Amino acid sequence: GHSFEQAVANLFRNIGYTAEVSNRGGDGGIDIILEKAGRKIAVQCKRYKSSVGPHVIRDLWGTMHNLGYDEGCIVTTTGFTKGVIDFAKDKNIYLIDLNDILRSTSNGGEFYLRNRLGDR
């Protein structure tokens, strides 16, 4: 639901991003738009019962190009399949599992998040 997206957006705000939760219209499934220091990142939030599969990341990759995003990010609660992890390797797509954030105790997972997004 929408509260999930809001919670994720707040995590990014905590590390200095502006995060705009999009209202589901013609945005190619983008849930949150992040901006910081000239970077613009398209975020999709997935609350699945099982791991996020390759079709999700392929769709995001296409959407990023169509809408002119340099970077993308998928946030989930259930992890990612190997296919997704491989696909993301050489692309500017960051994979974030919320469970890892909850597990990483350092300042509420902020260090982990910054790391995942390649923040300097």
Where are these regions (language model features)?
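Mixed-charge (Asp/Glu-Lys/Arg
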Residues: G1-R120
